[in-house]
C-alpha cells in the first residue's frame, strides 16, 4: 500500500498520501493510499493494482456521483478514510473528446450595443457533451419574451451556428439527454404544445394528416439530425426538390402542389409568422420562431409600406413572398436594422429550421416559461421548487456543475459575463469550483437568489420610472442578472407536460435503467425498485443500490 501511495506522490507534487477505502460491488473492501491532489485517472491505476478490474472498466462512485477521470479527488470533497464504491463497467469505446467551443470573441458580423436590456437576441449554446445545450437556439428577449434554458445573456445565434459547425456532436449529445428524449418520445406533450396555438390547431383540424406528422417524434429527430449534419441537410433539400419536380411533372401534379400550398403550407406560414392581436409575442405564438425570421422580415417590410399593413394582419391575402428554406439559415435579419427590437419580438436568425425552437411556448418541460413570467428569464420560487424535483433536470444540472470545463466554455460564450469574470478572479475561481456550483444551484439557494433578483428588478423598474429612463439602474446588478439567468433557468423546467403515472416504470425510467446498467448494475428488477423509491434520481438510486450490497 505504501508503494502505491508513493507512486502517486510525485504526480501531484503536493499533499501527503492518505488512505482511501474501496468497496467493490461484490462486497469486498480494501484500502489504497494516494494523494487527494491526484487525478481520478491516476487513482484508477492504483486501484487496478489491488483489484482485478482494469482502470478503463472501473466506475468509481462517491456520494452518488461517478468520478470523472480528468477531475481531482479533492474536487469531489474526498477525505482520508472515506469510502469509494467501485463497480465494473463495460470497456469504453475509444472516441475523440468533444472539441471545445472555439469562440472566445464575438462574431464580427454581429454587432449589438449594450443597452438597458441587451439580453434580447442572445441565444444559448451547448458548451459540451451531455450539457443539455438548451436547444442552443433560443431567441431571447427582455420583458415578456420567452425565456430559454439558460435565460438571457448568452451569445448570438450566429455564433452558436459557428460553434455547432465546429463541434457537430453537440446536438447529438443533446439528443441523448433524458430531457430531450422525454420530449421527443412524448406525443401527448407535443400534441398539447401544438394545440396551444390557435392557428396551428385550426390547421391540424382541417388537415388531420398534418397532425400525425407534427406529433411524430421521428420528425423532431430528423430535424435535429439535419441541423447537426450539413451534408444531410443538403441531401434532404435535394430530395425535396426532386420530389417536388417529380410531382409537378405528373398529370394534375401542379394542381396538387397548388392545393398543398393553399391548404397546408400557406396556413402553416401564417401560423408561424403571425400572432394575431398578441403583438407578435413569441410567448403567445409558440411556433412563431420555427421559421426563423420570416415573420420579422414580412412585418419589417410592412412597417415601411403602410398599404400592406392591414392585409398582413388579416391573413386573408395569399402570401406572395417566396417561402424560406426550412432547413437553412434565414436571411430575415436584412431588414432588422430598420426596426427596434423590443421585448415583444426578440427572434434572431435561427439554426436552420430550428431558429427559435428554444422559444416554443409549450416547451415548459425543457426549461422555458410562459409569457406571463414576471422576469422573462427566471421562474418564481414556488415554480422553481417544484420543477427542480425532476430527476432529468437534476441529472442535467449535476452533469454541468460537476465538470468545470463545461462552465468555462459556457462562461466564455458570453462577452459580458466573460469580462465580468476577468475583472474578478475570485469570482472566476468560485465558478470553477464544483462544490460551490452544486451548492449555488441547490433549490434553497436559488430561491433566495431569485427573491433577491426580484427585489432588485422591482427597485430597478421603480428607479427607471422615476428617472424617466428605461433601465437607468441596470448597471449595478447586471452581473447578478447574468448569473441568475444562467443558473436559474438551468433548472427552470420539469418535464411536467403530462401525467406519467400510468406509464410502466420500464418505459418511464428507460434512460435511467440504461445508465445504471452501464455503471455495472445489471439486476433490472432491483434497479427499477431503486428508481421507483428515488423518483427516478439516478444518483440516489446508485446510493441505494450500493447501500444494499453486502447487507
From Swiss-Prot:
Record field: compositional bias (Low complexity): 465-475
Gene Ontology terms, MF aspect: polyubiquitin modification-dependent protein binding
Limits of the UBA domain: 504-548
Major localization listed first in the record, in broad terms: nucleus
Self-association and partners: Interacts with 'Lys-48'-linked polyubiquitin chains via its UBA domain. Interacts with RPN10 via its ubiquitin-like domain. Interacts with PEX2 and PEX12.
Gene: DSK2B
Record's GO cellular component terms: cytosol; mitochondrion; nucleus
Keywords attached to this entry: Cytoplasm, Nucleus, Repeat
Biased composition (Polar residues): 294-319
Cell compartment(s), UniProt: Nucleus; Cytoplasm
Phenotype upon changing residue 61 to A: Strongly reduces interaction with RPN10
A Pfam match: UBQLN1
SMART domains named in the record: STI1, UBA, UBQ
PROSITE patterns assigned to the protein according to its UniProt record, in alphabetical order: UBA, UBIQUITIN_2
Start and end residues of each STI1 domain: 143-184, 197-236, 373-410, 414-449
CDD domains documented for this protein: UBA_PLICs, Ubl_Dsk2p_like
UniProt tissue specificity: Ubiquitous.
Domain Ubiquitin-like, residue spans: 18-93
Protein name from the UniProt record: Ubiquitin domain-containing protein DSK2b
InterPro entries recorded: STI1_HS-bd, UBA, UBA-like_sf, Ubiquilin, Ubiquitin-like_dom, Ubiquitin-like_domsf
Cleaved signal peptide residues: none
Region (Disordered): 88-127, 294-336, 455-475
Primary role: Binds and presumably selects ubiquitin-conjugates for destruction. Prefers multiubiquitin chains rather than single ubiquitins, with a binding affinity for 'Lys-48'-linked ubiquitin chains. Acts as a ubiquitin receptor that associates with the 26S proteasomal docking subunit RPN10 for the indirect recognition of ubiquitinated substrates of ubiquitin/26S proteasome-mediated proteolysis (UPP).
